[in-house]
Structure formats: C-alpha cells, structure tokens
Amino acid sequence: MIITNKKSLPEPMFNFANNDKQAPKDNVVRVTDLNKGIREHWLYKRHWHELEQDVSDMVWLMFGTAVHSVVDQAEERSHQIKETRLEEQIGDLILSGQFDLYDAKRKIVTDYKTCSVWKFMFDDFSDWERQTSVYCWLLRKAGFEVEGAEIVALMKD
C-alpha cells in the first residue's frame, strides 16, 4: 500500500502510517476481513501494493491504535490474557484474529472499540457481534471456556 501525505501532516504521523501497513498474506483471513464483502476482500489482497491512502484519512485509525496501546500497557492479571493472536486452519486458509482481552474468571472476551456516536444512533452492532463471536470460537478451539463477549466503546465525537 502506498501511503501519501498530501496535507503535510507531521512526519511522525506519516511514519507511523507507513510502519503500520503489512502486506496481506494470500492464505490468511483475518477476523475483521469477515465483515467485508468477498469481492472487496480478494480485490484488496490482489491489488494491495497498488492501493493509495493518505495519512490524513488514517487519523481515526491512529486514535484507535493509541487507545489499544494504553490498554495494552495496563498490567495483566493472572486470570487475564490480552492482545493475543489466535489462528485456526480451515481447509487451505488460516483464520487469524487478535482479541483485546480474555478474562478466565468471567469467561468473557472484551473488545475495545473507538467509534462515532452515530454507531449508537443507528443501533447497528452486527459487525461487532460477528467479530466477537469469532473471537469466542477461536478461544474455544484453543481450549478456553468462553461464555460471551462484551464491547467497550469509546466514542470519538
């Protein structure tokens, strides 16, 4: 992916945006990819190296990354696992997902989200429900007891 800086944002923001992008692997499907249409997903993978995005369009992505960084720095309790990537082979593909927090005492997966207040105004959380359901499934496949999931939403506006 080609990252541009057409609005001349500070260099650290541009550098962060460039360091954050990894080419997608052909046989790996990330949990967040499941919320995309199949054509969108495969076209993105096929043309990733041609795609262009300006750093000014990534500010809210950086905000979300900053929130996750703060949460990740919090001390993990003995009954908690945080920011862990799980993978499950399904045929020729690998389903890969990184959950934010699993609490073994509560048997709950927590996912931190940054969003607009409009997410709540429109009351459509189906994408979040799908994502956390897959995290629950991946954790169960890895041998953990999971009773459910919760979302901690931080609204940016």
List where the protein language model places each region.
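Metal-dependent nuclease catalytic cores that hydrolyze phosphodiester bonds in DNA/RNA
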Residues: 1-109, 116-129, 140
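Residue-level recognition of conserved beta-strand positions in structured domain cores
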Residues: 111-114, 153
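Substrate-binding beta-hairpin/strand module that engages nucleic acids
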Residues: 142-157
